[in-house]
């Protein structure tokens, strides 16, 4: 990797710290405000330079579309964080939610996994996602119809199959005993925390 300027190193550290503290990268406006830039455009130019040097990937179309391309040595050593119970209103990757780390290669999944989520309940059993399994999740704020997502509805985090129709989102279970969760985007809060990219049987890691 080409060496970074002091300002680029400062921005990269800010991005890493924001992801560590909140589970998501900062917006351009947040970077500009924290580092004293006059506009978000100045932050964007530095982000482009970091992308050219291979430190980050810029994902178009979203205000937080920044992805680190190189894992820190500590992260490689620790492995993927396992997320247990998620407290209402807290970022899913907040440190207090991490039960432990598993030495799983993120690249064994496509796209690569960013964290593991302990499955609770049997609402997705018909596609082999069972109680106690570890769901490999790729962080993403966007989803296409038919994808299995980790979604936050108001303060509840759930794993369901995503379907959007107009101004409504339906979160479908893969178990006929459960009705779809209907979310009216005009009146309810919904965010996508990530996409399911694989399942690890809990018994495989005892």
Swiss-Prot record:
Q: What's a BP term from Gene Ontology annotated to this protein?
A: proteolysis
E.C. numbers = 3.4.21.88
Q: Name one GO molecular function term.
A: serine-type endopeptidase activity
Q: What class of enzyme is it?
A: hydrolase
Q: Where is the active site?
A: 123 (for autocatalytic cleavage activity), 160 (for autocatalytic cleavage activity)
CDD domains associated with the record: S24_LexA-like
Q: Note the InterPro entries from the entry.
A: LexA, LexA-like, LexA/Signal_pep-like_sf, LexA_DNA-bd_dom, LexA_repressor, Peptidase_S24_LexA, Peptidase_S24_S26A/B/C, WH-like_DNA-bd_sf
Q: Does the keyword RNA-binding apply?
A: no
Asked if the Swiss-Prot or TrEMBL record annotates the protein with the keyword Glycoprotein, the reply is no
Q: Which family does it belong to?
A: Belongs to the peptidase S24 family.
Q: How does it assemble?
A: Homodimer.
Q: Which NCBIfam families match?
A: lexA
What this chain does, per the entry, is described as: Represses a number of genes involved in the response to DNA damage (SOS response), including recA and lexA. In the presence of single-stranded DNA, RecA interacts with LexA causing an autocatalytic cleavage which disrupts the DNA-binding part of LexA, leading to derepression of the SOS regulon and eventually DNA repair.
Q: What is this protein called?
A: LexA repressor
Q: Which source organism does the UniProt entry give? A: Shewanella piezotolerans (strain WP3 / JCM 13877)
